[in-house]
Amino acid sequence: MELLCCEGTRLAPRAGPDPRLLGDQRVLQSLLRLEERYVPRGSYFQCVQKEIKPHMRKMLAYWMLEVCEEQRCEEDVFPLAMNYLDRYLSCVPTRKAQLQLLGTVCLLLASKLRETTPLTIEKLCIYTDQAMAPWQLREWEVLVLGKLKWDLAAVIAHDFLALILHRLSLPSDRQALVKKHAQTFLALCATDYTFAMYPPSMIATGSIGAAVLGLGACSMSADELTELLAGITGTEVDCLRACQEQQIEAALRESLREAAQTAPSPVPKAPGGSSSQGPSQTSTPTDVTAIHL
């Protein structure tokens, strides 16, 4: 006897892309005007933090990314949480024993802003192996909000993706794949402190350029594509080329090398071994091993 399951995954209602908004130059200019407000000023490892080092931030970032993947969060939750983390660390000296607590609170805040069903404090405590209590997260949530002046609607690189892709006019059968690859680049950039002080528009533009060239999604040469992308966001061509070739693609090669040497470490599961939210309509970004250089 054969069994046939016709039950589909329940999807949350979503509005489709609005061509008028995507094509309105005022939307893009508004984001470009606001983005500098949310970029850390200078390296906080040199002038603010005494105990925390860059490799500690990277370890925390990988853990936060794994939690987001396990919970099938929206693609922009993780980079937004890293933006909160960098902005807090750029102005408040923090002990290394408090770093995971800070990262957990940043995940909580980002999910509240960008998720339909945000992560719960209890679930986040499970992911820390009960290393922190719910009351600590609640206290630090208020603390982080105060230090960020309650300004949580930060402009991040993800906000530019749809606007830039709309202006590229790529073949319709390649747009989704290019976007997915670009999202992977953005997640990778968020784990690397090198990109913390880059304008989000430059990171988004460089990520799309790397994705388009890697997939061969258009007939333009590398120089022509770079000039077109630079014109869309008003970025200098040389700066964009350096960001794409010397930083983003180099970071990807390093990540691929690390992935080949070490197996991914599992994160603690929610009760029952799976997300209590059930299947989600959002998917995690394409794995770095699926990227074509």
From Swiss-Prot:
List of residues that carry Phosphoserine: S265, S280
GO-annotated biological processes: cell division; G1/S transition of mitotic cell cycle; hyaluronan biosynthetic process; negative regulation of transcription by RNA polymerase II; positive regulation of cell population proliferation; positive regulation of G1/S transition of mitotic cell cycle; regulation of cell cycle; regulation of cell population proliferation
Domain Cyclin N-terminal: from-to ranges: 27-152
Keyword Isomerase on entry: no
PTM comment text: Phosphorylation at Thr-284 by MAP kinases is required for ubiquitination and degradation by the DCX(AMBRA1) complex.
Molecular functions per Gene Ontology: cyclin-dependent protein serine/threonine kinase activator activity; cyclin-dependent protein serine/threonine kinase activity; cyclin-dependent protein serine/threonine kinase regulator activity; protein kinase binding; protein serine/threonine kinase activator activity
Keyword Ubl conjugation in record: yes
Subcellular location: Nucleus; Cytoplasm
Predominant location: nucleus
Disordered: region residues: 257-293
SMART domains: CYCLIN, Cyclin_C
GO cellular component: cyclin D3-CDK4 complex; cyclin D3-CDK6 complex; cyclin-dependent protein kinase holoenzyme complex; cytoplasm; microtubule organizing center; nucleus
Compositional bias segments (type: Low complexity): 271-286
Pfam families: Cyclin_C (PF02984), Cyclin_N (PF00134)
Subunit structure comment from the entry: Interacts with the CDK4 and CDK6 protein kinases to form a serine/threonine kinase holoenzyme complex. The cyclin subunit imparts substrate specificity to the complex. Interacts with ATF5. Interacts with EIF3K. Component of the ternary complex cyclin D/CDK4/CDKN1B required for nuclear translocation and modulation of CDK4-mediated kinase activity. Can form similar complexes with either CDKN1A or CDKN2A.
Family the entry assigns: Belongs to the cyclin family. Cyclin D subfamily.
Function: Regulatory component of the cyclin D3-CDK4 (DC) complex that phosphorylates and inhibits members of the retinoblastoma (RB) protein family including RB1 and regulates the cell-cycle during G(1)/S transition. Phosphorylation of RB1 allows dissociation of the transcription factor E2F from the RB/E2F complex and the subsequent transcription of E2F target genes which are responsible for the progression through the G(1) phase. Hypophosphorylates RB1 in early G(1) phase. Cyclin D-CDK4 complexes are major integrators of various mitogenenic and antimitogenic signals.
PANTHER family (UniProt xref): CYCLINS (PTHR10177)
Record's protein name: G1/S-specific cyclin-D3
Organism of derivation: Rattus norvegicus (Rat)
